[in-house]
């Protein structure tokens, strides 16, 4: 019973860390990375379609993304979708290939992005603590129903705390890497 609670908590904590990593991928650093455009959708045959389903996105060099559109008619729509996004990018079209040069980040913008990244990391920590609270509540319920002893309760809470500490530590490591990436000129 306790092992199931711990396993569930650990899986949920790992998912929270992965979700944070995915959220941070969408925050632009100075380098071009295809995942930067992963949140962009294009109007295609009356439905919003993710960019990666209508085009191929690759990093041409450290400052340029190249988008190869599968359907030539979509080039204008893809270009418009990128301009309408809040990424502040100006795509240039050349037939079926759209090049997106990434302007260098200003110091002020870097600091703003670091604040955003820290906020995302804090949201991740809050999610981890909520998972800990849920797991501890489940263990307390077992104790209340006299299915486990107080010693088992204490031991389970200590183990859940260790899982929490490990998850928070990995969030802090992800945050440190992203901050370093952002502050590199």
From Swiss-Prot:
<dbReference type="InterPro" id="IPR002661">
    <property type="entry name" value="Ribosome_recyc_fac"/>
</dbReference>
<dbReference type="GO" id="GO:0043023">
    <property type="term" value="F:ribosomal large subunit binding"/>
</dbReference>
<dbReference type="GO" id="GO:0002184">
    <property type="term" value="P:cytoplasmic translational termination"/>
</dbReference>
<keyword id="KW-0648">Protein biosynthesis</keyword>
<protein>
    <recommendedName>
        <fullName>Ribosome-recycling factor</fullName>
    </recommendedName>
</protein>
<dbReference type="InterPro" id="IPR036191">
    <property type="entry name" value="RRF_sf"/>
</dbReference>
<keyword id="KW-0963">Cytoplasm</keyword>
<dbReference type="Pfam" id="PF01765">
    <property type="entry name" value="RRF"/>
</dbReference>
<comment type="similarity">
    <text>Belongs to the RRF family.</text>
</comment>
<dbReference type="InterPro" id="IPR023584">
    <property type="entry name" value="Ribosome_recyc_fac_dom"/>
</dbReference>
<dbReference type="GO" id="GO:0005829">
    <property type="term" value="C:cytosol"/>
</dbReference>
<comment type="function">
    <text>Responsible for the release of ribosomes from messenger RNA at the termination of protein biosynthesis. May increase the efficiency of translation by recycling ribosomes from one round of translation to another.</text>
</comment>
């Amino acid at each position: 019973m306790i092992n199931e609670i711990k396993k569930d908590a650990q899986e949920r904590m790992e998912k929270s860390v992965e979700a944070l990593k995915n959220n941070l991928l969408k925050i632009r650093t100075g380098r071009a990375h295809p995942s930067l455009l992963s949140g962009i959708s294009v109007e295609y045959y009356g439905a919003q379609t993710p960019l990666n389903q209508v085009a191929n996105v690759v990093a041409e060099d450290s400052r340029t993304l190249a988008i190869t559109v599968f359907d030539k008619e979509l080039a204008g729509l893809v270009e418009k979708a990128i301009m309408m996004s809040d990424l502040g990018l100006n795509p240039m079209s050349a037939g079926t290939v759209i090049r997106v040069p990434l302007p260098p980040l200003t110091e002020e913008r870097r600091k703003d992005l670091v604040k955003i990244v820290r906020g995302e990391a804090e949201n991740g920590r809050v999610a981890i603590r909520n998972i800990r609270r849920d797991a501890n509540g489940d263990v307390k319920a077992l104790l209340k129903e006299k299915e486990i002893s107080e010693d088992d309760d204490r031991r389970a809470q200590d183990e859940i705390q260790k899982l929490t500490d490990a998850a928070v530590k990995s969030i802090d490591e992800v945050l440190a890497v992203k901050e370093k990436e952002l502050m590199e000129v």
